A protein has these predicted regions:
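Membrane-interface helix-start motif
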Residues: 3, 313-330
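Juxtamembrane extracytoplasmic/periplasmic/luminal helical "stalk" adjacent to the first N-terminal
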Residues: 5-101, 108, 139-149, 167-191, ...
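Amphipathic alpha-helical bundle/coiled-coil segments
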Residues: 52, 56, 129, 207-210, ...
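Extracytoplasmic/periplasmic sensor domains and loops in membrane signaling proteins
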Residues: 80-90, 111, 115-177, 213-227, ...
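Short acidic/glycine-rich beta-turn/loop cap or linker motifs at sensory/regulatory domain boundaries
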Residues: 106-111, 197, 210, 242-247
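A short, hydrophobic, proline-anchored segment that marks a local hinge/packing element in signaling
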Residues: 167, 187-198, 209, 283-285, ...
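Short, hydrophobic beta-strand elements of compact beta-sandwich sensory domains
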Residues: 202-209, 291-318
Length: 330
């Protein structure tokens, strides 16, 4: 059957119109998609500021507790009279009030007089510990530190066991021959104890172990992401890493468990841990893609020891979330 010239022209115009419509639709969709990704990434960057604030706030809370206790007359008096056990009950209240995992008193030479959380362990020297060294120089100090299993065992076997992980294979991780991790990351503070003349008598040191401690990451999720879910999955997540290992996280795996013991994507590890640069891109997190932000965590000697992460599920629905407390973000 022959098609008239008029019909051929009409069909040509129709084909051009359809093609143009498809192209325009593709361009519009691409522009919208990139805009949504850009806006989500900006929100994640802002959320990372909030996460850092929350992490630092917990550290400062511990530091205040140690400082105000170190200047109490009852502590100084017991120290001078060498009757440290008399203040044990007061120190145990401090441990409970500030959620401390360890609290230790040392003399002016760095010798442990008493571990209030583990009274059976004392008499060893902590003079090589950088926190103790600074405190005995009459300087207060707080920060992040990584402790080996042998160091953790001095604080208690239960604490050392809580720190230990069997590594769980994770897609896109950097290959490793290691099967376990036994070190622990702690938030820690130490302050000098002075006599009436300002002479250093010793130091008080305390802190919390972050391994399997979900207080900070859950606070980040609750404040910044409102605990919102999509198809049963948390939209906003947070993690504290020791190296590239998730030691505290609310990322959930396919079995419905926290993904502690899994590792970060290889590209993230190389940029953040090896180069010391933040990662502000999409990343594969355990079993899904997220719009993410990672930054290094450094110890008091400026060594990179881990990472702080926040992420928003990439396939979250529009219009999405905005952090609830932008006034906290700096």
């Amino acid at each position: 059957m022959k098609v008239s010239k008029r019909n051929r022209i009409a069909l040509s115009f129709l084909a051009v119109a359809l093609s143009t419509g498809i192209i325009i639709g593709f361009i519009v969709n691409s522009v919208i998609t990139h805009r949504v990704i850009y806006e989500t990434q900006e929100r994640v960057k802002e959320a990372l500021n909030g996460a850092r604030w929350i992490y630092t706030a917990r550290m400062n809370e511990i530091d205040r507790g140690i400082y105000f206790t170190s200047v109490r007359y009852i502590l100084r008096g017991a120290f001078e009279k060498e009757k440290v056990l008399l203040i044990k009950d007061d120190m145990e209240r401090l441990i409970a009030d500030y959620g401390l995992d360890f609290l230790t008193l040392v003399d002016k030479n760095g010798i442990v007089l008493l571990r209030f959380h583990n009274p059976g362990s004392s008499g060893d020297s902590l003079i090589k510990d950088p926190f103790i060294r600074e405190a005995l120089k009459n300087k207060g100090i707080s920060g992040t530190q990584v402790l080996s299993r042998s160091e953790l065992l001095k604080e208690g076997e239960l604490l050392a066991d809580r720190a230990a992980f069997n590594l769980i294979p994770t897609p896109r991780e950097k290959p490793t021959e290691e099967l376990t991790e036994s070190s622990g990351m702690v938030l820690k503070s130490a302050h000098p104890i002075l006599d009436a003349n300002g002479k250093v008598l010793g130091a008080l040191m305390g802190g919390v172990l972050l391994n399997r401690n979900y207080e900070i990451v859950d606070r980040i999720k609750s404040i910044l992401f409102k605990d919102t879910k999509y198809n049963g999955k948390e939209i906003g997540t947070a993690t504290v890493f020791l190296g590239d290992l998730r030691i505290s996280t609310n990322v959930i795996d396919r079995e419905g468990n926290r993904a502690a013991g899994t590792r970060a994507m290889k590209e993230v590890e190389e940029q953040v841990l090896e180069k010391g640069l933040p990662w502000m891109h999409r990343a594969f997190v355990v079993d899904d893609w997220y719009i993410t932000a990672y930054e290094p965590i450094r110890d008091i000697q400026d060594k990179i020891v881990g990472m702080l992460y926040v992420g928003i599920l990439e396939n979250e629905p529009l219009p999405g979330l905005k952090p609830r407390v932008s006034g906290l973000l700096t």
